[in-house]
Amino acid sequence: YRSLVIMGGGVIGVEFATFYSDLGCEVTVIEGLDRLLPGMDRELGQNLAQLLKKQGVRVFANSMVQRVEQGEDGLTVHFTTRGKEDFVTGEAVLSAFGRSPNWKGLFADGLQPETDGRRIHTDENGQTSIPGIYAIGDVSSPVQLAHVAAAQGTACVERLACRTPSVRLDLVPGCVYCRPEIASVGLTEADGKARDIPVKVGKCTLFANARTMIAGTGRSFMKVVAHAQTGV
């Protein structure tokens, strides 16, 4: 494609934006929330938006897609940004709004677990509302990552064996294959404040790092969020 419109600025959206932009494609990203990567630390999304724009990617945040129309010049995506109508046309449109768990049809009629309409409800042991039936992975977890599902499986079996789980499902490492790459683990600064945890933040730039200099990204940094009293 010579032009691509990506609806959704989460992990999948920005990874494809980076990939197609590097191939010379004209890329536009439309995100409904106030920044890219809304599920990660605010600074990551804000800095990534600047980097993508520097790479030629157009980014529209706080923008809601209204409709997509087929025309002679391609597909036109109509959207509103803070109430103002706008549109962008591309040869193709990628829907990166997210994925829905596919659990329907797994249970017999009359034997349905409690759900919120999307995910299956489980307790702290991974057990559903049906005694003896457990659920792990995308069907029950808000974090749709393969290593999270694997960790949930390990924890579930350990609990069934009356052992204390050896994994921490609240400390999930993750990465984003954009340029430069992003990696994170643990609570964000906003998460800590939302839980009334006193936090202190340390940050250093990586401008002198060899990888940063060779790649020429120019905005690499490391950020550590720790408990203000214990430093952990």
Language-model segments: which ranges?
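C-terminal catalytic lobe of FAD-dependent flavoproteins
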Residues: 87-114, 130, 184-232
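Short gly/ser/thr-rich secondary-structure transition/capping motifs
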Residues: 74-80, 113-121, 207
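Solvent-exposed alpha-helices and their adjacent loops that cap or buttress functional pockets
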Residues: 69, 85-86, 127-128, 132, ...
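FAD-site-proximal beta/loop scaffold in flavoenzymes
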Residues: 1-2, 87-160
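Rossmann-like dinucleotide-binding cores of NAD(P)H-dependent redox enzymes
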Residues: 1-5, 11-85, 142-150, 158-191
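Conserved N-terminal phosphate-binding loop of PLP-dependent enzymes in the Aspartate aminotransferase
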Residues: 56, 121, 224-226
